[in-house]
Amino acid sequence: MKKCLIVDDSRVIRKVARKILEELKFDVDEAEDGAAALEVCKRKMPDAILLDWNMPTMSGVEFLRALRREPSGGKPVVVYCTTENDLTVITEAMGAGANEYIMKPFERETVVAAFTEAGLV
């Protein structure tokens, strides 16, 4: 079973995303911010990460840059998920190592399409 880490400071978003990803047969972990996500990744590197942009403590892009610098960081597929519909944000996310980009609020089909496009489903 593939592992996915949901990183978002919104409990509601994590709950909705968990339901969708579990339907897709992912083993799901959650983190409220980038710092907590790094700790989860040190214990158990996921195959995929659904990552929010704006979070307290450590933003999504800060987390992603830190993860990609880790020698043992592996290369999980990262699907960026945010309310920001700005080319600068999208460019920064992709430049930091995101594989896919979806907008919040998202529909189930959007998440499924992003994970399918990334080769995870």
Q: What is the meaning of each model-derived region?
A:
Residues 15-23:
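Charged docking surfaces used in two-component/phosphorelay signaling
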Residues 25-32, 40:
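Short hydrophobic/Thr-rich beta-strand motif most characteristic of the beta2 strand and flanking loop
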Residues 33-36, 59-65:
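Acidic catalytic/metal-coordinating carboxylates
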Residues 44-50:
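Active-site beta3 strand of CheY-like receiver
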Residues 55:
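Receiver (REC) domain active-site loop signature in two-component systems and cognate sites
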Residues 62, 85-100, 113:
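Alpha4 helix (beta4-alpha4-beta5 surface) of REC/receiver domains from two-component response regulators
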Residues 106-115:
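C-terminal output helix
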